[in-house]
Structure formats: structure tokens, C-alpha cells
Amino acid sequence: MIPETYSLVLTTDYRVPDPTRVWPLLQRRRDGLAALGAHHVFVYTSTTDPERVLVTIALETREPVAELLRSRAFIEWFDAVGVEDLPAVFAGELIEQFDFVADPTAAPTGIVVVGIMVVDDAPLFRAQVRETQDLFLKAGVRRVRIFEAFDDPREVMFLHELSDEVSAGRWLNRPDVAAEWFSDAGVGAYPPLFIGRFAHMMRIGDGNGTGS
């Protein structure tokens, strides 16, 4: 989903009445995103909730995050797309990645499953993921990413990319997978598990944007 060079991210997960408005608004705010240190933006649309969107902004450094969250432009952007409640926001860095595709830098083409959660023992969680690589591969998982929150090492964003919706459904319906990897997703202030498809990618600075 995200190549290794995009190691610092700001992810927002929210519901809007019309998800098609999100991409044009992001494009119009390209200069503002560049000023805050963003170099790529990824947009995903949910396959289970027609009003749900996940946006990941890849950053050059950590420093702009607090500034971005406090900025008037950040709040105004959510108002513009119709967000009624401020969404869940995850800011963190890549700490673990696995690729089961020939070209790990290729744009995502399948289904992404994203869970934001708190784990009791982050190093143990990472070790368990490493030990389960064969299971991921057999299940049709194409990429795995683990991001650690800047302000809490126990808070992680756990991302899988699978080849299609059928593979994703089989993966999520496995009792062992649901219990071990996603049981804490959606608990407390964290959003429910996000299941969606890549829609758009913007490269900040070169004027290019792509979409499905």
C-alpha cells in the first residue's frame, strides 16, 4: 500500500455524505499540503460503507504534524467535505513492512484492511507478525505495514493489502485472524476496521495525481 520511503504518515478515517468531493478538495489544497511537508497523499474508499473514506498523507518530517492538526485549513477542509464530527487521526511512522509482490513500489490495486489499535506489547506484536509471514502469503496478502504512533509506542496502525475482496473476506472471516490481529480495532476512541479500495494518489510537488 505504502512503499518504504513513505515512512511518516498522517491518516484520517471519516464518513462524509459524498466521498467524491474528497479528491477535488485535496487537489485544490496541494500548495497548503506541500507547505506542511507532505509529499504524497493516498485516498481509499470503503467497500463496506459508501460514506467512509480513509486518507493517508505521507510527510517529510514529524515536525509539521502538530502544526497541521492545529491549522485552520485542516478544520476547514473537513467542513468543506461535510464531516460533522472531527475524525479519528493517526500520526506515526513505519516500523515494520513485508511485501509479497514483485514490485513493492507499485501502486496498490487490491483491497486494504486497516486497523488502528493499542497493543499491550508492541515488540511482541511485531515479532508475532514476522513469525506469521507464511500465513499472510498463503491467504493472498500482498503487503503488510505496521506504523507506530508518534505519541504512544503502544498505538499502532496495522495495514494489509490483499488481491481482491474475496481474499479479504476469507482472511477476515478466519477466527484466529480476527481474534489475534483485529480484536482491539474499533475499541474506545478508535474507528472500526477499515476495508476499502485504493482510489487516488497525489505526488506533491510534481503536479501529478493518479486514480483508479
Roles of regions detected by a PLM:
Residues 1-212:
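Short S/T/G/P-rich N-terminal loop/turn motif that feeds into the first structured element of a domain
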